């Protein structure tokens, strides 16, 4: 199993907050919003060597969020998967 340092998991939250996002974290899951709506949900799966991002809006994932996640993915040789969840409207 791949071990991700606790500090790196906390650092993801801190970087997103510094970039101006509202972040709620539980273990390896992050709920990211912009104080008006949720933007995405991020799940880190160390065992599978994956970071999965599920976007919750019709817009593309903001570049600063993807850069923060890409940085941690590269550090641990993890695959970054970004998927869109389309609303039923």
Q: Which role fits each region the language model picked out?
A:
Residues 17-18, 22-42:
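Ser/Thr-rich, low-complexity intrinsically disordered terminal regions
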Residues 12-15, 34-37, 61-64:
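Short amphipathic alpha-helical surface micro-motifs
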Residues 1-14, 18-19, 88:
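Terminal, regulation- and interaction-focused segments at domain boundaries
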């Amino acid at each position: 199993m791949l071990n991700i340092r606790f500090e790196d998991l906390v650092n993801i939250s801190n970087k997103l907050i510094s970039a101006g996002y509202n972040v709620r974290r539980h273990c390896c899951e992050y709920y990211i919003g912009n104080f008006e709506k949720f933007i995405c949900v991020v799940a880190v799966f160390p065992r599978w060597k994956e970071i999965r991002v599920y976007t919750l809006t019709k817009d593309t994932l903001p570049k600063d969020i993807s850069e923060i996640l890409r940085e941690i993915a590269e550090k641990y040789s993890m695959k970054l998967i970004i998927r869109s969840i389309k609303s039923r409207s």
